[in-house]
């Protein structure tokens, strides 16, 4: 078994022992099993899911995954279980980021608002994908 912890600045969002975990690494989705080699990797907004069950995953923002043979610690700005994503909230974040991006002057401002918009868009898409009641 593999222990997985997902941690945000607000605290621990998930802690459980699983057989496998899939994470949204920058180079693509990464599947991790017990006895994985040591690795520290950057993650991007996407879905973390366990034991090949993507319906019960957790949407995460930017962060890092610290992988050891028996543990995965995901440190991320934001993490929300798929069923708890507030679609309206993330639509507002997306709209605000789009407005702010058009007014951004510095490379730092552009990068900040691009990241916020990408994370909001990813959370919106995850919510729509896993909730058939939500229309695109």
Swiss-Prot record:
Keywords: ATP synthesis, Cell inner membrane, Cell membrane, CF(1), Hydrogen ion transport, Ion transport, Membrane, Transport. It is found in: Cell inner membrane. It is a peripheral membrane protein. Gene3D superfamilies: F0F1 ATP synthase delta/epsilon subunit, N-terminal. GO terms for molecular function: ATP binding; proton-transporting ATP synthase activity, rotational mechanism. Disulfide bonds: none annotated. Pfam families: ATP-synt_DE_N (PF02823). InterPro entries: ATP_synth_F1_dsu/esu, ATP_synth_F1_dsu/esu_N, ATPsynth_dsu/esu_N. GO terms for cellular component: plasma membrane; proton-transporting ATP synthase complex. NCBIfam families: ATP_synt_epsi (TIGR01216). Produces ATP from ADP in the presence of a proton gradient across the membrane. Belongs to the ATPase epsilon chain family. F-type ATPases have 2 components, CF(1) - the catalytic core - and CF(0) - the membrane proton channel. CF(1) has five subunits: alpha(3), beta(3), gamma(1), delta(1), epsilon(1). CF(0) has three main subunits: a, b and c. HAMAP family: ATP_synth_epsil_bac. This is ATP synthase epsilon chain. It comes from Hydrogenobaculum sp. (strain Y04AAS1).
């Amino acid at each position: 078994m593999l222990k997985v912890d997902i941690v945000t600045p607000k605290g621990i969002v998930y802690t459980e022992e699983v057989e496998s975990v899939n994470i949204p690494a920058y180079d693509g989705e990464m599947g991790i099993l017990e006895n994985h080699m040591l690795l520290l990797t950057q993650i991007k907004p996407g879905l973390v899911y366990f034991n090949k069950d993507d319906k019960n995953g957790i949407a995460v923002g930017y962060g890092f995954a610290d992988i050891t043979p028996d543990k995965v610690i995901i440190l991320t700005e934001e993490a929300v279980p798929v069923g708890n994503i507030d679609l309206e909230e993330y639509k507002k974040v997306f709209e605000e980021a789009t407005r702010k991006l058009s007014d951004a002057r510095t490379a730092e401002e552009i990068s900040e608002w691009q990241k916020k918009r990408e994370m909001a868009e990813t959370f919106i898409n995850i919510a729509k994908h896993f909730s058939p009641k939500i229309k695109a």
